[in-house]
Amino acid sequence: MTMIGPIIIAVLIIIFLIVFFTLVPVGLWISALSARVPVGLGTLIGMRLRRVVPSRVVKPLIKAVKAGLDLEVNQLESHYLAGGDVDNTVDALIAAHRANIELDFSRAAAIDLAGRDVLEAVQTSVTPKVIRTPEFTGVAQNGVEVKVITQITVQSNIERIVGGAGEDTVIARVGEAVVSTVGETREHTDVLENPNSISKKVQEQGLGDGTAYTILSIDIAEMRIGDNIKAKLDIEKANADMEVAQAAASKRKAEAIALEQENRAAVVAAEAEVPRALSRALEEGNLGVMDYYKMENVQSDTAMRESIAHEDEK
């Protein structure tokens, strides 16, 4: 009995230590103390109970305090519970602080919760970003395609990040403006000779309004000539006209063949009446026997000549 008591006490102590070190990240608490960040053991235990990963909150807080930011653990924990990226948000605040950009925690958290990369927004507001667009195709007034790829230099506007249109809207607006500008050009050679005229006209249209960016410049990266749409349409029209003409000619040919067959039928019918007419003429005495034989000789002579002529042609 004297040995059971100490064993039970030892087991309880071990269980207590296991539970304690499970609930309390002692290493993280020591790191916070050494960095002079006011985080108590009770706060860390409360995070565990609220299913918050303490390192996801305390480490960014240590980083923020070291950078000279005035943040509290409750702010970061609330942002974590709301589904925000605490580490990225703190990095954005540090970058803004060092670049002398006015950005408080509430605005940074709102940008992050809106689904935008707040750190990228801060970095882009400091160092402009270059967006390379896909190929846009415009058609000049002479019917020749001009294919253009542009590079848009933009700078993030922190004030318009939440509620402002994104990168896709900027690209779509620039594409529409490029196509419209090329369409206003009389000759495609005018665009090739002066490509800056496109970028200048496009930039004058205020395409950055209502977006999260300020457009600094729009430059032509690549330009090439596409198909001659007008020539293609002319060829298609000529082919269509030719098909119509061929159809009309085929119709006339068919009508001529039909008329020829009708005439041949009429000739055959007329030839069939000749013997009857000769018979009536002989009966009525209008044609003599000698006249009839004379006519037969003429017909035989004509047939012989036609036969000889056909043989010579062969």
Swiss-Prot record:
Membrane association type: Single-pass membrane protein
Segments passing through the bilayer: 4-24
Pfam families: FloA
Annotated signal peptide: none
Keywords: Cell membrane, Membrane, Transmembrane, Transmembrane helix
Keyword Cell membrane: yes
Subcellular location: Cell membrane; Membrane raft
Chief site of localization: membrane
Annotated Gene Ontology cellular component terms: membrane raft; plasma membrane
NCBIfam families in UniProt: PRK13665.1
Family per record: Belongs to the flotillin-like FloA family.
Function of the molecule: Found in functional membrane microdomains (FMM) that may be equivalent to eukaryotic membrane rafts. FMMs are highly dynamic and increase in number as cells age. Flotillins are thought to be important factors in membrane fluidity.
Record-linked HAMAP family: FloA
Subunit and interaction comment: Homooligomerizes.
Protein name: Flotillin-like protein FloA
Organism (species): Listeria monocytogenes serovar 1/2a (strain ATCC BAA-679 / EGD-e)
The gene coding this protein: floA
